[in-house]
Amino acid sequence: MPKSKVRKKNDFTVKPVSRTPVKVKVGPSSVWFVALFIGLMLIGLVWLMVFQLAAVGSQAPAALNWMAQLGPWNYAIAFAFMITGLLLTMRWH
């Protein structure tokens, strides 16, 4: 009786599935986006400077009387502009 051939055993291992996130390639941000977040940060800075230099005290001009009436809310408004601009920088490519 003829002898049968012995087949080589291939060790087949299942490769683990790669679960690494795929980064989506995004193009560069447009010019208006950069101007927007820089503008928001500058508006906040100017708001804070105008409040500190011109709208505080009894010598405040009549045009800035409304700003003096806001009182400490001026800090919140100025920092809200600046933080919004800062948060937009995180979306900049």
UniProtKB/Swiss-Prot annotation:
Q: Which InterPro entries match?
A: CrgA
> Which is one Gene Ontology cellular component term of this protein?
plasma membrane
A Gene Ontology biological process noted in the UniProt record is: cell division
Q: Name the membrane topology term.
A: Multi-pass membrane protein
Which locations, inside or outside the cell, does it occupy? Cell membrane
Name the major location. membrane
Q: Which residues cross the membrane?
A: 31-51, 70-90
Name the domain of life: Bacteria
Keyword line: Cell cycle, Cell division, Cell membrane, Membrane, Transmembrane, Transmembrane helix
> Which named protein is this?
Cell division protein CrgA
Gene of origin? crgA
